[in-house]
């Protein structure tokens, strides 16, 4: 997706013929908040993603990828070497996965 997450929500809402009021009510947020999200003036709270996926019959994993990739992009786009930031972040994420995996195998009962 090359659009912002808010633009994506707007597209889903209009293609689904939902009004701001109806979608906001379904997400349990007020209409002005949803409008700000769609216009990029406010970020959508992460806890709303499962509701959004359910309403539009979307894969939650893909929706989370879009959501978090935008958050990362917002943090690094002003930097000149954004691709280097991404590479380093990916390496750190892999390290954290491996570290957590190793820690998960420790048998604390017999330690």
Regions found by a protein language model. Give the residues of each.
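A short, Lys/Arg-rich alpha-helix, primarily the initiator
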Residues: 1-15
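DNA major-groove recognition helix of helix-turn-helix/homeodomain DNA-binding modules
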Residues: 28, 45-62
């Amino acid at each position: 997706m090359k659009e912002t997450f808010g633009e994506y929500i707007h597209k889903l809402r209009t293609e689904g013929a939902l009004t701001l009021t109806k979608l906001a009510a379904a997400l349990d947020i007020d209409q002005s908040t949803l409008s700000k999200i769609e216009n990029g003036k406010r970020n959508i709270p992460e806890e709303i993603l499962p509701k959004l996926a359910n309403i539009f019959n979307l894969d939650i994993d893909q929706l989370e990828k879009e959501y978090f990739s935008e958050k990362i992009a917002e943090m690094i786009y002003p930097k000149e070497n954004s691709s280097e930031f991404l590479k380093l972040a990916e390496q750190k994420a892999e390290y954290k996965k491996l570290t957590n995996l190793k820690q998960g195998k420790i048998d604390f009962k017999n330690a």
